[in-house]
Amino acid sequence: NKPAGKLPAQATSSKVSIDQSGNIARSIKSGTNVNSLLQSINEKQYCEIRKNNVKQSGNVSVGTGMQLCVINNNKVVKSYNIIVTGDTNGDGKTNITDLIAVKQSILGRSSLSNIQKQAADMNNDGKVNITDFIKVKAKILGRE
C-alpha cells in the first residue's frame, strides 16, 4: 500500500532525532517496539526496521545497532543505525547489563563500539563518564 508519487530518499521525524549525514536515528526510548518506532517516522510506509539485515515487525523491541531502512523497489536507499538511549547491548532495554557495560568502559576494563558509546552517553555531551553511569542507574531504578 505504498502511495503513488515521489519516493523518499531519506527518513524524517518530529519525534526521533535523525542525523542525515551521520546516518543515525537516536532519541529512541528503551522499550520502544518496531510498530511504535515506525509510527513516528513520516515516511513509515517506505521504511523497515532490520536486525542483521532481517526485517523486524510488530512488538519486537527496537535495540541499539538495528537499522532504520528506507526502501525503494525492494532495495535499501538509505540506512540509519538506531541508538536506543541507555541500551548498550542492543536488547532494547536499559538494565543492569547496560549499567555494567558503562562502568567497565569508564574504568577502562572494556571498550564500547561507537554506537554503544552513543547509547551510553545519556546526557549527550559526547563522553561516557560517571554522569552517564548515574543516569543509567536512575533509569533502571525508575528515577529518571
Label for each model-derived stretch:
Residues 3-6, 14-31, 35-144:
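Cellulosome-associated attachment modules in secreted, modular CAZymes
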